[in-house]
């Protein structure tokens, strides 16, 4: 083998990289175990322990525990539990604001029509709007709509329609970016470990958010869907406010000493970072960690009695700026509780508002201290004197000293009020507040007129960029609405972990046994070693990408292992052929690797093509599956073709392993000299296939498919009851209350206690409270089959599994459903086209392409037909959803592997025996590759059966589709693709001979 040195170096470097990234997972698990041991079952204390070490350097003196947790392999929502949502910024609302909410009839009608068409069209709202407006108002320029004050520097009366459309796209993109920045900030404050938020570039206005471990979905819904609220406030100085805080501390001493504390008010006097919780365990925890003695702990308790507020709030009595105090983030909630008491509020000025800074104090190396700002409310209505809707633009730049700064422009009204505000506060600070948190409080040097300002300070470039984003978010014209949602409870996630691990282990063991049984112990173990390396490298690469491992991802990894065996099977089968030809082991093995390379390369590349299409058209779990599948295939190519070759070359260079036969007693002569007449009955095979396709089409046309909410829109609720229930009983209960809405109920699992309820009830309605109202309505409807002590709070608690509760839920809005349906069709069509083109390029004969695409189309129709025939009869769900489309594409990728290997042998035989009859040549090609075809199919079926039986309900339908794909894909390679290619070549040759005879 050439380039052995490069392969060795690459393998060593890849191993080191994978060890490095995987090591973070071991570090975090070590400290998680210590936290569990310390907490002794108290979840809160366990979390406090981990939080106390979050900014401590725990790994090689360079990485904090927080950084290690960010670098570890994260678990997806279906394994860890949590919430996945897709939010959509209303593009029509943005356009309305940009047009200054014009009442023009043509404008409003065009916009309404565009919004309606966007749910089914592949064109975006802007394209549809422009088209409709030109229909309704022929010759009317767009500039007359958008030459507004807000767009005065971008659109004039002389702007062309193309220029206006470009500006609209830029403004909509900016609005989505603003929403993205607001959501990112809100999520960071929520304290979620390893959140994932990304703007879906191919879908205008949509943002995907994944929040592992979330236990309060209703709170998250409100957090994500709220409008951004940017405000500019006047401020107090710390020196002015300190006396009031001293009075509050004195008042609290009496309250805390009292046996009946004053009733706590529900106030927003100071909003804490959401990660903070009212707890007094932080101090005792710190003492335990630092080894403080009981006397010190007792002294601290006495101080907290005498100075309840100042024991946890460090004041800044002589400060000239608006920062009045500092506190550890663990204490902020308790401080809020104190400051919100009516008795304490009575000690404060009526115009004083205390708000926390959004970021930790910059001089705290542990990043655990937050600043408390004193805001002055000077308006009679209690609102801010200036709000973010007046900000026209903001950008980060550098001042004339070369330091990071932020420039900001306001509209005419904002410029006038800004001039007045800055004039009244020269020498003082103005706080920039978003969603109740202070982002910056720059000092006013002089009156600012004209509406253009520059904010300077000790900014880093990143901080300047963040502040510019905050200022831009103030003009967010429309809030984001949830159009798709998945919520998975933690125990359901644990069940998925157990099922995934079990299916993976069993599949790996059976594959290892199979390889040793078919090719002998040493060759089998070499192939098995490649599988283990494949697993190690795949996990390492996933960890380096900070990709989340999902159940679909595990399925992709397991399937990649099954497909990885294909390369070893090809190499070993070719080696056996060379041995039968009388070659020595060294020469036979070298030729086996060389002759198998093109087939391995082509089959892997076609699978990667389908994986890329799957990644581009899928979201969430489907992308996770595609990611692990692509990585697994790439790694399997490296390990099977190069790593195993290094092993054999090393030992054979020392004249060892020269007695290998690459077979066992079972497989020694298995299909070695078969001579099936495949081509002799090609018309029979094609007739049978055609009949099967017609039957499947008939079922699809009459019975149809069971479409999931991915394609119809709606909500799924997976509900677990205390006792066994009948799905029909649940369906009747819900149908009686949900009116004309579609309702379906199916059993999940075998214990009869879990059902999945699907309905499109009120799915087209929008609003922050719709989801909560439907959950409450579902609770009232199911009360007769719930235990008597179950409350609404218990019923919607994903962690509760006693008495009956929702353990997971899913929502897909109508616009998302239409997009998924269109994307699914395009993904399958593009996969067939891409594979057809690739086969044409590689094999230089259209007969191969037509044969392959025709066979793949038959595979797809027959799988769809099987689902149409079987749904309602099988003891598991056969709904058509995104996962099913993933299975179809994966089956296409797998099926083409067989066809590529067979056509590769046909091409090889054409070169070796150019005068041999095509009929015999095709038969010989099919017979010589039959062992490989059957071995690969069996090894892949072993994996799929493990997933199907042990992988859990969530992945069973996927495995079933893949099993059908492997079976029909194997048959179509032998009885559809090859006969069609043969007949096309035969007809072409006959045509050429006819032309020659003329």
Stretches with model-predicted labels:
Residues 8, 12, 533, 538-541, ...:
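Hydrophobic alpha-helical transmembrane segments of membrane transport and translocation systems
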Residues 23-31, 51-56, 60, 68-435, ...:
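Non-transmembrane, solvent-exposed regions of membrane trafficking/translocation machinery
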Residues 698-746:
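Juxtamembrane segments of multi-pass membrane proteins
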Residues 183, 491-511, 563, 567, ...:
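Pore- and gate-forming transmembrane helices of large, multi-pass membrane proteins
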Residues 1-17, 21, 25-69, 73, ...:
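Interfacial helix-loop-helix hairpins and adjacent transmembrane helices
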């Amino acid at each position: 083998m050439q380039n052995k040195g490069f392969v060795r170096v690459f393998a060593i470097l890849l191993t080191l990289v994978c060890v490095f990234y995987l090591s973070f997972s071991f570090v975090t698990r070590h400290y998680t175990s210590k936290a569990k041991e310390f907490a002794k079952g108290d979840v809160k204390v366990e979390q406090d322990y981990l939080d106390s070490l979050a900014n401590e350097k725990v790994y090689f003196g360079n990485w904090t525990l927080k950084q290690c947790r960010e670098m570890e392999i994260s678990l997806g929502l279906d394994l860890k539990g949590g919430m996945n949502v897709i939010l959509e910024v209303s593009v029509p609302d943005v356009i309305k604001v940009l047009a200054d909410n014009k009442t023009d009839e043509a404008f409003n009608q065009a916009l309404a029509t565009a919004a309606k068409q966007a749910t089914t069209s592949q064109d975006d709202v802007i394209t549809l709007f422009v088209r409709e407006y030109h229909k309704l108002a022929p010759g009317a320029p767009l500039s007359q709509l958008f030459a507004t004050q807000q767009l005065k520097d971008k659109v004039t009366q002389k702007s062309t329609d193309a220029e206006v459309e470009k500006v609209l796209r830029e403004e909509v993109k900016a609005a989505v970016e603003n929403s993205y920045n607001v959501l990112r900030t809100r999520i960071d404050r929520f304290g979620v470990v390893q959140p994932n938020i990304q703007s879906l570039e191919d879908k205008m206005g949509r943002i995907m958010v994944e929040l592992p471990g979330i236990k309060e979905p209703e709170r998250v819904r409100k957090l994500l869907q709220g409008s951004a609220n940017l405000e500019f406030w006047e401020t107090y100085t710390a020196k002015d406010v300190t006396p009031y805080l001293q009075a509050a501390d004195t008042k609290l001493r009496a309250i805390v000493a009292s046996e009946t504390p004053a009733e706590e008010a529900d106030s927003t006097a100071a909003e804490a970072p959401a990660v903070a919780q009212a707890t007094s365990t932080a101090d005792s925890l710190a003492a335990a960690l630092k080894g403080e003695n009981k006397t010190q702990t007792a002294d601290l308790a006495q101080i907290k009695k005498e100075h309840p507020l100042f024991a946890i709030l460090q004041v800044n009595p002589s400060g000239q700026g608006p920062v009045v105090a500092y506190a550890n983030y663990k204490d902020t909630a308790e401080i809020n509780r104190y400051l919100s008491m009516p008795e304490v509020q009575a000690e404060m000025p009526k115009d004083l508002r205390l708000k926390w800074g959004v970021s930790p104090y910059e001089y705290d190396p542990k990043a655990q201290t937050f600043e408390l700002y004193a805001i002055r409310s000077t308006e009679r209505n209690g609102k801010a004197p200036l709000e973010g809707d007046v900000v026209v633009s903001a950008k980060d730049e550098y001042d004339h000293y070369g330091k990071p700064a932020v420039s900001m422009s306001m509209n005419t009204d904002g410029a006038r009020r800004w001039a007045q505000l800055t004039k009244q506060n020269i020498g003082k600070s103005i706080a920039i507040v978003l969603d109740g948190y202070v982002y910056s409080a720059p000092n006013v040097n002089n009156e600012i007129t004209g509406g253009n300002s520059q904010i300077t300070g000790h900014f880093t470039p990143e901080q300047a960029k963040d502040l510019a984003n905050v200022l831009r978010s103030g003009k967010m014209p429309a809030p984001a609405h949830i159009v798709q949602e998945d919520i998975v409870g933690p125990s359901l996630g644990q069940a998925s972990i157990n099922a995934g691990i079990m299916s993976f282990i069993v599949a790996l063991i059976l594959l290892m046994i199979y390889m040793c049984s078919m090719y002998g112990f040493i060759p089998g173990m070499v192939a098995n070693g490649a599988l283990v390396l494949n697993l190690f490298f795949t996990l390492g690469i996933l960890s380096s990408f900070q990709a989340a491992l999902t159940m679909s991802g595990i399925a992709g990894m397991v399937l990649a292992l099954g497909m990885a065996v294909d390369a070893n099977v090809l190499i070993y089968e070719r080696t056996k052929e060379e041995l039968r030809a009388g070659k020595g082991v060294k020469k036979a093995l070298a030729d086996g690797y060389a002759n198998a390379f093109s087939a391995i390369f082509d089959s892997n590349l076609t699978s990667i093509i389908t994986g890329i299409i799957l990644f581009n058209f899928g979201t969430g779990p489907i992308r996770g599956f595609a990611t692990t599948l692509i990585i697994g295939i790439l790694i399997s190519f490296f390990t099977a073709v190069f790593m195993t070759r290094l092993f054999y070359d090393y030992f054979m260079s020392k004249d060892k392993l020269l007695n290998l036969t690459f077979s066992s007693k079972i497989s020694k002569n298995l299909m070695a000299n078969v001579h099936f007449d495949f081509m002799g009955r090609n018309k029979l095979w094609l007739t049978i296939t055609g009949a099967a396709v017609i039957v499947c089409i008939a079922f699809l046309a009459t019975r149809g498919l069971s479409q999931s909410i991915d394609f119809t829109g709606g909500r799924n609720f997976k509900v677990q009851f205390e006792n066994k229930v009948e799905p029909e009983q649940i369906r009747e209960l819900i149908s009686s209350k949900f009116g004309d809405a579609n309702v379906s109920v199916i059993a999940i699992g075998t214990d009869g206690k879990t059902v999945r309820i699907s309905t499109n009830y009120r799915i087209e309605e929008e609003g922050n409270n719709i989801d909560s109202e439907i959950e409450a309505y579902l609770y009232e409807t199911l009360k007769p089959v719930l235990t008597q002590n179950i409350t609404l709070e218990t019923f919607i608690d994903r962690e509760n599994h006693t008495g009956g509760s929702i353990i997971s839920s899913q929502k897909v809005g109508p616009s998302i459903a239409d997009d998924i349906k269109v994307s699914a069709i395009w993904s399958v069509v593009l996969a067939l086209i891409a594979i057809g083109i690739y086969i044409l390029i590689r094999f230089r004969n259209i007969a191969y392409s037509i044969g392959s695409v025709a066979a793949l189309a038959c595979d797809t129709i027959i799988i769809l037909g099987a689902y149409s025939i079987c749904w309602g009869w099988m003891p598991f769900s056969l709904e058509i959803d995104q996962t099913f489309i993933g299975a179809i594409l994966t089956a296409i990728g797998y099926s083409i592997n067989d066809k590529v290997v067979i056509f590769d042998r046909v091409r090889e035989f054409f070169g070796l025996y150019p005068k041999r009859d095509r009929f015999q040549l095709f038969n010989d090609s099919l017979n010589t590759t039959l062992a490989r075809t059957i071995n690969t199919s069996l090894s892949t079926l072993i994996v799929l059966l493990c997933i199907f039986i042990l992988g859990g309900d969530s992945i069973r339908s996927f495995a079933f589709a893949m099993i059908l794909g492997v079976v029909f894909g194997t048959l179509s390679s032998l009885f559809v693709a090859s006969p069609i290619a043969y007949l096309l070549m035969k007809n072409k040759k006959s045509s050429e001979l006819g032309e020659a005879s003329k």
